[in-house]
Each structure stands twice: as structure tokens, then as C-alpha cells.
Amino acid sequence: LFSRLAFVLMAVVFGVVRMRNAYMRCPVSIWLFLGVFLLAYIYHGVGITMGYHRLLSHRSYKVPKWLEYLIVSGGYLCLEGSPIFWVTTHRRHHRYSDKPGDPHSPLDGQWHAFLGWMYKPTVLISAEESRVLAPDLYRDQLYRFLHVNHSHKDGLLCLAISIVYRAAIWFLFGPVVFAAELLASICAFCAPLLVNLYCHKPELGYQTYACGDQSRNVWWVAILSFGEGWHNNHHALPQSARFGLGKGEFDFTWMSLNFLKLFGLVSDIRLPKKNKLAELETADVS
């Protein structure tokens, strides 16, 4: 939690204040800011949903290792932290969804679902459980290095690398690009937290499939998180690379995967069969 709060503080001190002065000097900076913000938001957002989530956590498709690292870097550089920690936490969430053992269910409170779970000892995952839940990631030397022997130092390492990355952006491209990239990374960091907070609340969204928990499809969360908000679909069919399964359920990450597929960079895409969808459909769509 400390590293994440420090990240937000860094944004306030070095980004927002300096950016105001840049706007006053050059109106062109506004368009530069918006362009960089959009590109950086896509880079970091796709890094989380396509990288950490659909690739590492659920293995719903395959890409060359160099591309895997490139995609995952987008999530790492917006302080998602150790991929091993992220994946083990997420796999545990699916195992105990909305039940005792779920790391970040909103049934334990809104603050808990958004950020509070990150520093509660009750949701910490031991090294032994982590190796059981994510043996595939432990076989990867880079992910083991970023995990720093299952200690709190993995967050400090992620923070340090992120600071160096953004210092390089400031040095090479100036304060406008720096501020835009930093703000985009903060927004991307918050997107999966919105999924935790709003996509398991019975009073929001709707359920298309019966999957034994409170997962909901929430359209505006799906827009902000590149398809993650179709959360009921995902919980019903966690191995599916496509989350937006219904009419009008826009899934930017799924579109991005199809774009990469045009160049032969994606293979073994996992999708649900129609008979499986029919089995899971609920009679009462709330």
C-alpha cells in the first residue's frame, strides 16, 4: 500500500503542478497531453487486462515470450506489482469468490474491496500457497526476480523501476509528456480496483450467467477497463479470452487480441462453446 500511495503523491507533486505552468506557456501542450494520455492509458490498461489477467492468470491465449513481456510491462509500470503476487491473488479470488478467503470481495466493505485488502494480513498469501496457485509463473526467471523471494520488497522494486522509467520520460520528453503518462498510469491502476468494488455488488449491473457468486456485468466499468467490467461473463467462463459475450458488450481487449492475430502474433485463443453458454444462462436477468 505504501508504494501505491507514494505513487499517487508523486503524481500530485511532480505532475499536476508542473503541468499547469506548461499549459500556460504553450496551448499545443494540451493536445500533446491528451494524445500521450490516450496512448499511455491503452499501454497500461492493456498491460493489466490482456497481460496480467487474460494471459498470465487464465492462460486464455498464447503469444511469443518477447510480446508477453512487452504486454505485461504495461501493467508492471503502473504499479500492479509482482506478476506472481497478482496472479496468485486473482486465482484465489476465483477459488473463493464472495466467500471466506476471497481477498477483495466488496461484501467485506467498499474500502476493503478498493484498496484496504492490500494491507490486511488476513488476505496475504503464503509462499507455499503462491507456489501452488501459480507454478507456471514460478518457472519464469523474470517473474521470480520481480517477486523478490515472496517479500514486501517486490512492491519497493516495482516502485523503484517505475520511478526510473518516469524520470527517463521527463528527461527525454519533458514535463508535459511526463504528466500525461503519469496520470494515465494512475487511471489505469484504478480500473481493476473499480472491478473489485462495483462488479460484485448485487444492486449494480446484471447477471447473464449463473456462476454461484455476486459477479455483475457493469457497462461503464467495462468501458473504462477495456472489457473487464463484463465480470459476470468472466466468472462464468474464466478461461475465455473474450469477456464481452452479449450484444452490445464492447470488449476493447478482445478487439486488440484480434488485431494482433492478424499479424500471426496470437495463437490458441480459448473461447466458450455455445452449448456451454446455454447451460449457464440464467432465467432471471437482473
Where in this protein do the model-derived segments appear?
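Asparagine-centered polar/low-complexity signal
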Residues: 196, 232-233
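Active-site-proximal inter-transmembrane loops
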Residues: 137-145, 204-230, 236-237
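Non-catalytic, topology-defining segments of multipass membrane proteins
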Residues: 1-194, 198-199, 240-286
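Generic secondary-structure boundary/loop-capping signal
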Residues: 52, 58, 83, 112, ...
